[in-house]
Amino acid sequence: MVDFILNAQVRSDLGKGASRRLRRNAAQVPAVIYGGDKEPQSVTLELREIAKLLENEAAFSHVIALNVGGAKETVLIKALQRHPAKGFVMHADFLRVVADHKLTAHVPLHFINEDVAVGVKQAGGEISHTISEVEVSCLPKDLPEFIEVDMAKVELGQIVHLSDLKAPKGVELVQLAHGNDLAVANIHASRVVKEEGSEEGAAE
């Protein structure tokens, strides 16, 4: 499952000073590729190219074809360091992907049917999201772009947990496997309803 392509060059000038010069003078981003029983490799990326890639949310949960000076590496984005004020990427970590080895990755949650949820449509409640992504473990071929959270049947006061999610075949939710059935979302009484109830009580 390779839908994204990124170009990189082997980096020989290492160190913090060299990294600063890359970002300042050449609009390039230092990065490292590791894992897969190979030595870590330092590379550089074009800032404009990786910024364009990251405009697509799916890039974070997809296998990426990284072309390094003519050689191809199949990787996942493992970590990004961003500028604290401006938000642009300052450094990237990529994990090599091996087809027959399980990997772990963070996958976004997509909440559906929120406007027709029982607790919203019938009881006037509001939905709160506790988490926006989950860590999964699977083979590279099974890595999902996202996992859906169907809110249609969720009632007022009800909490949706990891155990309520339907993970695709071959995909394991890491926290759930470790016994942590985290809350994902809930429907609670809206502030307007609460305030109206308080006013009515005071009037009586």
Swiss-Prot record:
It comes from the Bacteria. GO terms for biological process: translation. Pfam families: Ribosomal_L25p, Ribosomal_TL5_C. GO terms for cellular component: cytosolic large ribosomal subunit. Keywords: Ribonucleoprotein, Ribosomal protein, RNA-binding, rRNA-binding. Gene3D superfamilies: Ribosomal protein L25, beta domain, Ribosomal Protein L25, Chain P. The keyword Hydrolase does not apply. The keyword Ribonucleoprotein applies. Coiled coil: none annotated. This is one of the proteins that binds to the 5S RNA in the ribosome where it forms part of the central protuberance. Belongs to the bacterial ribosomal protein bL25 family. CTC subfamily. This is Large ribosomal subunit protein bL25. The gene is rplY.
